[in-house]
């Protein structure tokens, strides 16, 4: 607005100076009059604006143009103002009202500011009061906490220190039951409190309470000792189930032992010794009676005469009557005795039930049953001792007696045991029992089982050496029989060896393999000596083949895949089979074989002194053609007679006929090279005929 008024002022001044001059018109216009110009200029000298223009030296036209532009701008602004001015005037009442409201608000806010300032001062005062109250509250809380701690300690002290009348009544007059055990626990805590708490030792009340606690301790110890002794007496009664009594009575009151350990060490040692003595005697008697009972069930398998190389055929009637009952088939053969390994974890035999059935058992069955009973008893006792007494060493003191009883029994049995198979079965049983105890994680029988194992192996080695010695020292003249069928000693050997191979399949015992090899060498030597007693080589070979074949068949049952020993006898069988087949052919076709081996080979030599002629081979061809079938039939009958194993005999016959075909083929080849040999073609047996005969026997086979 100020700029607008200034512009109007300048315009009026210029109007007064220039009149109604239009700036857009050209000053050079001829219509403009210059009269009086000097006078007007003089009059305007005193004007400040004009003086400034003239003094600055600006051109009048340029200045006028600038003024014109300013005027136009002012004109435009005035137009905008003129447009907005009516709206402004229209809303002026509202603006006035708004101005009044703002003024009223300022008054209200000023009042509120004053009020809040007052509140702030009051809150500051209250905050100080609260802080004081908070400090007082914390102080009171700390004092309350200290009082409660003091009260708690004092209450606990009083509770741990005093002896309630009810506790005295239970300890002195009560029966030993669950309530009594709980009261013992309370008494134990009080005794420990008096012994260990320094505050109690300096307390004057100790003089009043300590004598009473000591009386209660002595009474409790006396009472629980009598209780335990009565239960130990119950263990000694015949037919008492020890394990049930331990589980239902002793373990139920096992805190008594803990109490005695802490507050009656001497009495605890007496109880411990009494339990050890009781259980030692009870278990020793138990195992002693069990051993005596199953000795009646024992089946004696072998004696000192039951060795592979010992001739037992000549035993007289009177000497037989003195021998114990034995299963002759089980002396050298494993048979059904292997079942004991498969039934290793079966329950122990009950003697009176087994005796009622009138059954007898090989010793390894009784051995397993005895050790099954020992394992179960030892496992139960070991766990009980650890749970009841809290120590493992007590077990070994208890079982010193039972171990001694069993050791004594085993020593007496092993010293007279000649059953090698039974001994190895017992060794395997011990091995499985060690595995069972390992799975149970019960180590209490480790040293015992090791000791038994150490006792078994030397005896087994001794008996095994006796068998080897019996073969080496056998009197061949006594045991020899004029029979080419398998010898009874070789059958014993085969069954004996097969038994040990079977028992060693899953164990791979190298020491046993060495002993079996020693046994094989001894029987090899013996069987060759027996074979040489036959007058004819053919009989010797038949005897050896029959024995080797039987041995292989027995060994295959024990180890179908074939082991080192079986392979050895297979090689011997193969070599003797070839020799026998050759011997059989020589017996029936000696001339032809002799010719083929000597003269047929000469035919290929360039330096011949004497050529083979038709006359030389013609008798051979005609002889073979006339009787070859008959000869094969005789060979067949001979083989059936000689060999107990039909399959083995057929193998030998087929091998012999195959060899015969080879000899005859070589003879034919020789004839083809002889001058005039074609004349013998009508007498030659063709190849197909011989093959047909071989196939015929193969079909029979």
Curated annotation (Swiss-Prot):
It is found in: Golgi apparatus, trans-Golgi network membrane; Endosome membrane; Golgi apparatus membrane. One of its GO terms (biological process) is protein transport. The gene is P2. The keyword Lipid biosynthesis does not apply. May be involved in retrograde transport of early and late endosomes to the late Golgi. This is Vacuolar protein sorting-associated protein 52 B. Keywords: Coiled coil, Endosome, Golgi apparatus, Membrane, Protein transport, Transport. It holds the Pfam family Vps52_C.
